[in-house]
């Protein structure tokens, strides 16, 4: 049997397992997730040893290193997240709409699983736990294609998950980890009839690859080219704190600030706006007006003149761009041209300007006077998320349990037939 044939055989088994998941009641699903959380401490050394093998192959200066890293604290957090998912209300079998037709037919629109969800992701082994929990809670089977950089970690995690599933007398094929080789991704992306939807989580290059090569429907998530616009009416202290938080809280995640846009009437305030960034050694790529305003006010080794490419970059590291604009309209145009439609923010005190920004900026999450770091399912009160959708169909913004469901119509009658 070729590797391609073996993968297809596994995909068929996952599809069969997905039909069994829908027969599980909510208590059985929650018990499995809680059991998995309870098993993590005993499995920690095995998982961390596998993770160390992955880390040894990566440069610690690589922005992906932090996302790849697991430790005891992060495993404890993962266990807590699993219990939190178990405690969430089930998104399944909810009556979304109901009506009685004039002919007496009773119609109900109810939430149901998507079926089999394929996830392609990079570096972050915690995603393996997160995705399984969210897919199971929403009644879906899961096919995972992790990156080769996290291969050892993902194998150890999936082995633990499948052990817990087997011990509870359930079908371990409800989760399947594809080989790390790139060819496996091509098979997944073209597994029409086996996979219901693909969700890529990672860099823009990964998302573009999935969109270009997939014949299975794709929900795009993750890539964020994020702006914060400091308006002429912005509060200086507020802007300074928001910029610092949005850039440095977790620079390797998709909601981190990439480009600060500053109204030219406030350019004299720019050194104060970015002064805290020096503490974290943030490298700044500034357009000429911003560069010369910061010269000798920000460390020379951390300051460069920006190129056009800087303004279309998702840095995922302690780097950012600064763009100065003459008008509010120019700020909107810059965002429209460079945004990935993930998260965008304004710092302003003029309500008319805030209202215009909120209405006219096209993004999944649009903020006024707060940090873009809040783009997160848990922060939105949605529970854990599978990613941040940057498209408009099916789901937009944090994809939590509800977004992992679709619906079907249930129609009950008393013998009605449709007239000729």
From Swiss-Prot:
Annotated Gene3D superfamilies: Aldehyde Dehydrogenase, Chain A, domain 1, Aldehyde Dehydrogenase, Chain A, domain 2
Disulfide bridge positions per record: none
Keyword NADP annotated: yes
GO MF annotation terms: glutamate-5-semialdehyde dehydrogenase activity; NADP binding
GO BP annotation list: L-proline biosynthetic process
InterPro entries in alphabetical order: Ald_DH/histidinol_DH, Ald_DH_C, Ald_DH_N, Aldehyde_DH_dom, G-glutamylP_reductase_CS, Glu-5-SA_DH, GPR_dom
EC number: 1.2.1.41
Subcellular location, record wording: Cytoplasm
Entries under CDD domains matching the protein: ALDH_F18-19_ProA-GPR
Pathway this chain belongs to: Amino-acid biosynthesis; L-proline biosynthesis; L-glutamate 5-semialdehyde from L-glutamate: step 2/2
GO cellular component terms given for this protein: cytoplasm
Known catalytic reactions: L-glutamate 5-semialdehyde + phosphate + NADP(+) = L-glutamyl 5-phosphate + NADPH + H(+)
Keywords: Amino-acid biosynthesis, Cytoplasm, NADP, Oxidoreductase, Proline biosynthesis
Pfam annotation, one family: Aldedh
Protein family according to the UniProt entry: Belongs to the gamma-glutamyl phosphate reductase family.
Function: Catalyzes the NADPH-dependent reduction of L-glutamate 5-phosphate into L-glutamate 5-semialdehyde and phosphate. The product spontaneously undergoes cyclization to form 1-pyrroline-5-carboxylate.
Protein name: Gamma-glutamyl phosphate reductase
Species for this entry: Chlorobaculum parvum (strain DSM 263 / NCIMB 8327)
Organism lineage string: Bacteria, Pseudomonadati, Chlorobiota, Chlorobiia, Chlorobiales
Gene: proA
């Amino acid at each position: 049997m070729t590797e391609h044939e073996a993968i297809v055989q596994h995909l068929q088994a996952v599809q069969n397992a997905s039909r069994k998941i829908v027969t599980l009641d909510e208590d059985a699903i929650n018990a499995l997730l809680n059991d998995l959380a309870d098993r993590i401490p005993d499995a920690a050394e095995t998982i961390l040893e596998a993770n160390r093998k992955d880390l040894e192959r990566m440069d610690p200066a690589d922005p992906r290193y932090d996302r790849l890293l697991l430790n005891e604290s992060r495993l404890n957090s993962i266990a807590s997240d699993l219990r939190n998912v178990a405690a969430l209300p089930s998104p399944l079998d909810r009556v979304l709409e109901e009506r009685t037709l004039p002919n007496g037919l009773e119609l109900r629109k109810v939430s149901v699983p998507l079926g089999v969800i394929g996830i392609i992701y990079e570096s972050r082994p915690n995603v393996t736990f997160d995705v399984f929990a969210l897919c199971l809670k929403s009644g879906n089977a899961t096919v995972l294609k992790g990156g080769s950089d996290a291969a050892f970690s993902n194998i150890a995690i999936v082995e633990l998950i499948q052990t817990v599933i087997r011990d509870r007398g359930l079908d371990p094929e409800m989760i399947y980890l594809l080989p790390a080789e790139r060819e496996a991704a091509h098979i997944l992306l073209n597994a029409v009839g086996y996979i219901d939807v693909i969700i890529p989580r990672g860099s823009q290059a990964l998302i573009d690859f999935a969109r270009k090569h997939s014949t299975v429907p794709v929900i795009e998530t993750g890539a964020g080219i994020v702006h914060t616009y400091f308006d002429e009416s912005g509060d200086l202290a507020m802007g300074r704190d928001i910029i610092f938080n949005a850039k440095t809280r977790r620079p390797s995640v998709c909601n981190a600030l990439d480009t600060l846009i500053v109204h030219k009437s406030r350019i004299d305030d720019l050194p104060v706006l970015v002064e805290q960034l020096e503490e974290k050694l943030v490298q700044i790529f500034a357009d000429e007006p911003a560069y010369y305003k910061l010269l000798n006010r920000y460390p020379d080794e951390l300051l460069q003149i920006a190129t056009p490419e800087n303004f279309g970059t998702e840095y995922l590291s302690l780097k950012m761009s600064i763009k100065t604009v003459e008008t509010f309209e120019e700020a909107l145009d810059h965002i429209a041209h460079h945004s990935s439609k993930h998260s965008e923010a304004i710092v302003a005190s003029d309500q008319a300007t805030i209202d215009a920004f909120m209405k006219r900026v096209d993004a999944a999450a649009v903020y006024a006077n707060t940090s873009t770091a809040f783009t997160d399912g848990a922060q939105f009160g949605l529970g854990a998320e599978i990613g941040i959708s940057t498209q408009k169909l099916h789901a937009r913004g944090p994809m939590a349990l509800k977004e992992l469901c679709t619906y079907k119509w249930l129609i009950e009658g008393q013998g009605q037939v449709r007239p000729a």
